[in-house]
Amino acid sequence: SYTWEFPEGQSLESITVSISMKEQGGYYDQYLIHQLTRTDERADYASDAVFANFRNVAVGDLGENAFFRSSSPVNNELGRASYADDLAEAGGIQAVMNLADSNELIEGYIAAEGFDSPYYQSLYEAGKVKALNLGVDFTAADFKSGLAEGLRFFAENEGPYLVHCTEGKDRAGFV
């Protein structure tokens, strides 16, 4: 908060404050970003990939279509799992780092009525999913050690690789 101090004899009513920007519309893009809302309706998104937050991560020496991030292909809490699962299969994903869930949670999702992520299930049953059950504190010792465990898992397995959390933006975005 800010406390306004007025010269003697002046009050808020007697002072005019003017705020201007360096350029017209200079903040408009940021304004629009802050107006974004998330829905759980597929029709509100341009594509299955946008809905599932399924993205190729091609930076540095990583080649195209070698490493992906997404929302959860196994936890259908947001209604995106089957979309992420289909995209993982189409991308030829061979190893998965699940930052959000434990093995017990994954097995619960698979056993749930209406589960519709057969590709993820096949990877899990083949030992190609590393369940890390990490929180969102990237500075925590357990996050650091869990991430190291996940990266070793990737090094021991062939790609393409997928890293995901629940929504695919915080933990997966950080990784």
Spans of features found by a protein language model:
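Cys-dependent protein tyrosine phosphatase-like superfamily
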Residues: 20-162, 174-175
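Cytochrome P450 heme-iron axial ligand motif
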Residues: 167-175
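Charge-biased, low-complexity intrinsically disordered regions
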Residues: 1-25
